[in-house]
């Protein structure tokens, strides 16, 4: 999405529809429709159960569902409350670093599909946090042979980071973290939402980047830092400056 779209939320508390899959929301493959096509009672009297993926991480799925032909998308994920390493939607998973992700769509997700998306996301997280023997962050998952940007679109990661960094939102990434993935495609960061504390509730002297999930590791990857700098210089900075008034305050 263009930078202008992200900028619109900087100066206001957003009142809008909840993130959802659809032509006016996240326009990706509707897996709920695909599930309903092969499960006559989809959405009624669903029962969930727990299992472990190949990384040994727990996920919750909907029992008894017939899977659609393509389980690679679309998914809409949102981070759960960081105070508890447990998803609070019907289906979701917990990563190796204690990040609980809700699967917002499809609302009811079969076992194979949940294994797929939880393992895909874990491979991405492992790539972000990967280090070489000297402790340098590489962004490379040696087990899968892929870089983090081969799992998640790099530009979307940069956009979400810059927006939340500029907004100085305490919820950024900690709670306000969403991803979506279409069938056969990469994961994308966003849409940005749940910024009810924005803007500026983190003071100038506070450390926004240090210790924050994903961000603290991404910023130690040289390629990500370069991508942030390039996008900020070429696109983001001009849009941000339009919002800044006298004294450096974001205009309302």
Predicted feature residues:
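Phosphate/dinucleotide-binding and metal-coordinating scaffold of catalytic cores
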Residues: 1-252
């Amino acid at each position: 999405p263009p930078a202008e779209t992200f900028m619109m939320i900087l100066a206001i508390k957003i009142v809008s529809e909840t993130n959802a899959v659809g032509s006016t929301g996240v326009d990706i493959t509707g897996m709920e429709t695909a599930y309903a096509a092969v499960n006559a009672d989809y959405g009624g009297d669903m029962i969930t159960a727990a299992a472990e993926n190949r990384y040994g991480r727990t996920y919750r799925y909907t029992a008894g569902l017939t899977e659609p032909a393509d389980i690679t998308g679309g998914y809409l994920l949102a981070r759960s409350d960081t105070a508890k390493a447990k998803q609070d939607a019907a289906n979701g998973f917990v990563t190796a670093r204690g990040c609980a992700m809700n699967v917002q769509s499809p609302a009811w997700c079969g076992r194979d599909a949940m294994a797929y998306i939880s393992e895909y996301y874990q491979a991405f997280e492992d790539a972000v946090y990967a280090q070489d023997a000297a402790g340098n962050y590489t962004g490379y998952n040696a087990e899968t042979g892929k870089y983090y940007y081969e799992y998640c679109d790099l530009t979307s990661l940069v956009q979400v980071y810059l927006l939340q960094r500029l907004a100085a939102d305490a919820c950024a990434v900690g709670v306000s973290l969403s991803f979506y993935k279409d069938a056969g495609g990469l994961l994308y960061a966003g849409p940005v939402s749940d910024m009810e504390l924005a803007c500026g509730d983190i003071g100038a002297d506070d450390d926004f980047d240090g210790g924050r999930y994903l961000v603290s590791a991404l910023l130690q990857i040289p390629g990500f830092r370069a991508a942030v700098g390039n996008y900020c210089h070429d696109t983001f900075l001009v849009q941000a400056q339009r919002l800044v008034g006298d004294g450096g305050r974001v205009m309302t």
